[in-house]
């Protein structure tokens, strides 16, 4: 298609397109997603361990003319960006890249993160996705980022709101409160606060919200389960103690001495079998 430029996998050099307007030249650099292993072989004299090392090496190899306006299109996770449940990130932030590596660029158009946001400075920006892809994005307003490059150093950034046909939302309350809502075809996560499970809750809620996508409960039982799963000293407790806590959480009462003996005997048998 005319005007569409596609950059393939990194092959040692960053492709660029040179355009001109009334203010002079604009150089658009196309940097595909890279990993340390992707670029290491192209820079044998450099120590490339992290994603930051990889991007630094690539940026240092680019022959930028600082008299021109330079735009970088990049698909990396930049330190400080706020991710949602939809994106995959490396444990411990190993895939993070410092936004300061892009200081020579007049504008950096970032992809990968779904939430529209700037990082470090207004000219380093994720435009975000046009639609919401997980309920962690329910409170996120989507938009199109419009960037006007005027003379060198003069960048104007505006956001044009995107209003979806069906929004993605979360609502919370008792079952009777949820059923009293106005009918809507939005994509919903419904959180019920009733202490007892509602039979066929999803089918009933579909009468008001036909596009319900997820149903959860938030009550004393589920909160107790969350506390149990997150117990900080679980590693310091015996299997019998952990089982006892789980039993009490589920049954609302402690085990009897007879039940404890049965559990102890079963655990002993399991350990002896190993």
Features from the language model and the residues they span:
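Short, acidic/turn-prone active-site loops that include or flank metal/cofactor-
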Residues: 10-12, 130-132, 217-221
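Conserved beta-sheet core of the metallophosphoesterase superfamily
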Residues: 6, 79, 84-155
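A general structural motif
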Residues: 23-25, 66-69, 105, 185-187, ...
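Conserved catalytic scaffold of divalent metal-dependent phosphoesterases
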Residues: 2-93
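Binuclear metal-dependent phosphoesterase catalytic core
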Residues: 14-26, 31, 124-187
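Short, structured coil segments at secondary-structure junctions
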Residues: 2, 104, 120, 208-211
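Short, conserved loop/helix-junction motifs that constitute active-site signature segments
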Residues: 64-66, 100-104, 181-183, 208-209
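Accessory, non-catalytic peripheral segments of nucleic-acid enzymes
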Residues: 148-274
């Amino acid at each position: 298609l005319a005007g569409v430029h596609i950059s393939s996998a990194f092959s040692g050099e960053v492709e660029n397109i040179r355009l001109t307007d009334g203010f002079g030249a604009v150089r658009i650099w196309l940097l595909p997603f890279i990993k340390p292993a992707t670029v290491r072989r192209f820079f044998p004299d450099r120590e490339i361990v992290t994603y930051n090392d990889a991007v630094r090496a690539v940026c240092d190899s680019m022959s930028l003319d600082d008299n021109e306006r330079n735009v970088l299109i990049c698909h990396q996770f930049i330190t400080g960006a706020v991710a949602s449940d939809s994106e995959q990130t490396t444990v411990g932030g190993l895939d993070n890249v410092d936004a300061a590596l892009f200081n020579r660029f007049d504008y950096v158009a970032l992809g990968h993160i779904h939430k529209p946001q700037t990082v470090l400075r207004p000219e380093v920006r994720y435009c975000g996705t046009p639609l919401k892809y997980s309920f962690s994005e329910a409170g996120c307003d989507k938009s199109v980022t419009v960037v006007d490059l005027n003379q060198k150093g003069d960048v104007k950034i505006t956001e044009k709101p995107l209003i979806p046909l069906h929004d993605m939302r979360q609502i919370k309350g008792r079952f009777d409160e949820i059923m009293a809502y106005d009918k809507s075809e939005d994509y919903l996560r419904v959180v019920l606060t009733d202490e007892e499970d509602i039979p066929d809750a999803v089918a009933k809620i579909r009468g008001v919200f036909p596009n319900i996508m997820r149903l959860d409960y938030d009550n004393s039982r589920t909160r107790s389960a969350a506390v149990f799963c997150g117990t900080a000293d679980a590693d310091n407790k015996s299997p019998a103690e952990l089982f006892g806590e789980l039993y009490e959480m589920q049954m609302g009462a402690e085990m009897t001495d007879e039940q404890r003996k049965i559990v102890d005997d079963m655990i002993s048998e399991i350990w002896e079998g190993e």
